[in-house]
C-alpha cells in the first residue's frame, strides 16, 4: 500500500501574479522536490501534457474570447469541449484525490469529474473575497 496519495490539482490560477498562484506553484515544486505524484491541471498557452519529475501537467488553452475576470485571470465557457482529454488524463494518472482551488472553469472540471468518477475531493479557497472586493 502506497502511503503517498496521487493528487490531481485543478488550479484555476497558476501563471498569474497573485498569492493563490504563488501558493500553487510552491505546492507543485514541493511535490516535485519530494517525488510525490501530482497531476496539475491548469491553463496554458497551448493544450498539452508535459512531465517534470513526479509532476505531470495538463495545460488547457482557453479561447481568445474567454471572459476577463481580473488581470490575466479569465473564464472560458467553452473549456468543456476538452472534458474527454481531462477525463482520460485523470484515468491514466490514477488520482486518489482531487484538489479544487476555486470556483472558476478549471475547478469546475475537477468538481464534475470527482463526482462522476467517484474520486474524493478537497477544496481550498485562497482569497478573502470581501477584502479583495473592497480593494477593487
Model features per residue range: what roles?
Residues 1-56, 61, 90-93:
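N-terminal subdomain of nucleotide-sugar transferases
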Residues 7, 97, 114-132:
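Active-site proximal beta-strand in glycosyltransferases
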Residues 27, 86, 110:
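Aromatic/hydrophobic pocket-lining residues that form π-stacking "cages" and hydrophobic walls in ligand
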Residues 32, 111, 115:
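Anion (oxyanion) recognition and catalysis
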Residues 44, 81-82, 103-106:
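Short beta->alpha connector loops
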Residues 54-88:
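A short, charged, and often flexible helix/loop element on the N-terminal side
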Residues 65-70, 124-136:
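Acceptor-binding helix/loop patch of EC 2.4 sugar-transfer enzymes
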Residues 86-107, 120-124:
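Short N-terminal targeting/anchoring amphipathic segment
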